[in-house]
Amino acid sequence: MFGLFLLASVLLLGLIIAELLVGGGNVTLSDVLQAPSRPQSLAQIIIETIRLPRALAAVLVGAALAAAGVIMQTVLRNPLAAPDILAVTSGAQLALIIASLLLPFAFPGFLATILGGAIGGGLCLLVGGGLRAQPVRLALAGVAISLAFSALSSAIVLMADDRASGILLWSSGLLEQSGWTRVASLAPAILAGILLLALLGRQFDVMALGNDMASGLGLGKAPAIIGLLATVVLSGAAVSIAGPIGFIGLAVPNFLRAVGFHKHGLLLPAAGLLGAVALLAADVAAQLLSSPGTIIPAGVFAACFAAPVLILVLRRIKGETRTRANVVSQKVLFQRKTVLYPVLAGLMVAAFLLGLLFGDGVAGWQTDWNTVYALRMPRVLIAMGAGALLACAGLLLQLVTRNPLSGPETLGLSQGAALAGLAGLLIGVVPGSPLFALLALLGAGLVVLCISLLSIRMSPERTALTGIAVAASLAALSTIIVIEAKLQVAEALSWLAGSTHGRNWQDVTALAPWLVLIPLMMILARWFDILAMGRDEAESIGLNTMSARIWTMLLASLAVAGAVATVGAIGFVGLIAPHAARLCSGARYRQLVPVTALIGAILTAFADMFGRTLIAPQEIPTGIVTAFIGAPLFILLMRRQSR
């Protein structure tokens, strides 16, 4: 253990020196060594006002997040617990954005992050099952709440207009500092929080023995409450300094416990030291990879490692090895299809007409018809077509995985297709072209293969969490491509969130051939019914289940590729629409496929309309609206699945 402390200390010193050297300004090692004796030099000014505050910010934020992760995992007895996983970070981020943009004089920024972090963490515990909730369920609840908070944060940021670019960078986890103000004001809170946790180290050691043992030794609830409050303060301070940065609080404590650190008297200082090293290393690497004139936030670079870290932690958790779950709804609202289809048709017509009626204002039919035809109608049609494709893709994914929590977004297919599409843009592929769609298909297909291999013998909850981790890593890589390629950041991130903005009749023409997949799925409905019976029954009837599963996954990947190539990664439609369809029409795929397509089209069309009108003349990307609606529904599905 002493060797690890020594190694981490040497690495910390080396990384601090590296932090002072990288970046703009051409600072050399000689300048760093001679800075104290050359107080008026340009290099000394750069080091003192930019580089040193940034290095100290990385040390403080990394230490705070790692220490918070240690205590969360101890108190909750959950190796998946971390500020970013349990919605503390996203709650603090949302609160700080509200305080900065909407209520600038209501709360100081640091107080806002504490309140927001406490609300986020409290909601996570409330919907996830409390302090003794099952680990994966609590983590999924936190992720769902984080998605809803992030969607709301993005919507507020879009209203900021000229301030959006800077806030978008901060929201990605940016350590860059302009002077010592933030670091100096928040360093005492971080140091005091870590010191308080260290003083309670013995109580946390007792807590780690288990509830019965801790109660028998007379340990009350006060240390747990104090510990969780301290983690909220540490997380809030970290967000105030650098924005939301993930996976430091998850990876560092799990690594230290894996190598033998269990007593909190050693675990906490080791976590603080290693957390500082990890974040410094991420920031140095991000700056080295940044081309001149670009900034890769350290938080984005750290998020690239989300999938491997979370998958390794999931592998360490024992139990919960249910391999498959039933995705069939037991209750059917519409027993008579002569009622269901007219209702859906009416909603479809209403969504279409309202989409034409409302644009970037409330002028309605007073708007010139040529404007409606040229600008609004293509967007409405594309929203409906993409929603239908994503919904049917989710239906097939839930069939193949027998997992009610599966969807293009929870398994990472949408993000994989979007990443491949962005890579195509870098080599000159035209969006909407067949080659662009082929690249999106390749990205989605590779993710399907990856998730299929990783989720063997996993429970539905673990599979969903694995897919979300893969999606986070792919989204981070997409952000790096956007930054490095010097694309229009706001527009590119809007497309990544899923948007119909700027779509025209040419895009409608490009999307139309993909809609052939829906009648093809209807033709194959009997296959799907047999496949839904289970492997043994399906093979006894004569169906080659392996071949059927491969073709079904290919169909799902094709549907995702067609939608993402046109509108980007719209989330939650493919997760929610199939469940709504089962509730409306039952389990037979001959009815499920068209009903799912109609519900997906209706949901996406309404989301697009609300996105265009809620904060007009600005727009909220369709994917943000669906995420804000879908995240609570995802929590309901998860709670239903856990029963």
Regions found by a protein language model. Give the residues of each.
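Alpha-helical transmembrane segments in inner-membrane proteins
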Residues: M1-R643
